[in-house]
């Protein structure tokens, strides 16, 4: 299931509490770079709007299976998944602080 499909299901179920969306996550990305470090390893380095960086990796066991485009897609997805975790923590902290300040 893609992020877009998940978002559509969330909306169809009218789940409207504070949450992250794929658009929010994408809006945090300032720059995305790819580096091929060996015959089998692709690294995605994402710089966020605040300057923090996250990385994602993709590797295959055999150089015969290496595909640049596929490596970039997988490594970016892995890096973006880390942004979801970071932003999820930040949102939870903001909700916690708001609850404790009431």
Where are these regions (language model features)?
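Domain-level marker for long, solvent-exposed, non-transmembrane regions
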Residues: 1-102
